[in-house]
């Protein structure tokens, strides 16, 4: 069985680190914004161990002062080509 992970963990870590925030400080800022979390929750997000719902994405973006789409990794043309070829392969008769 394939394990799925959230895609934004590494980007959240980079954005948090760029602001000079510890996981504890980031968790406190998220709590002030209304999100129920703690340092352990931030750690799990960054380690890609938990799925994130829309509300969580909005809290993260709000506190980090970025657009939600900036939380997701950038995809290059190679990724899109690979996706296209994978879809093409699965639709062959």
Please provide the spans of the model-predicted regions.
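Short alpha-helical DNA-recognition segment
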Residues: 19-44
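DNA major-groove recognition helix of helix-turn-helix/homeodomain DNA-binding modules
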Residues: 49, 53-70
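Short, charged recognition helix plus adjacent turn
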Residues: 2, 62, 72-93
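Helix-turn-helix DNA-binding elements, focusing on the entry/boundary residues of the two helices
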Residues: 12, 23, 39, 54-57
């Amino acid at each position: 069985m394939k394990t799925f992970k959230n895609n934004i963990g590494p980007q959240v870590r980079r954005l948090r680190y760029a602001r000079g925030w510890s996981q504890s400080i980031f968790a406190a800022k998220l709590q002030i914004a209304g999100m129920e979390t703690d340092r352990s929750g931030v750690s799990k997000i960054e380690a890609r161990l938990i799925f994130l719902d829309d509300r969580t994405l909005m809290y993260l973006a709000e506190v980090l002062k970025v657009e939600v789409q900036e939380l997701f990794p950038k995809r290059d043309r190679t990724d899109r080509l690979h996706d296209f070829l994978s879809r093409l392969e699965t639709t062959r008769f």
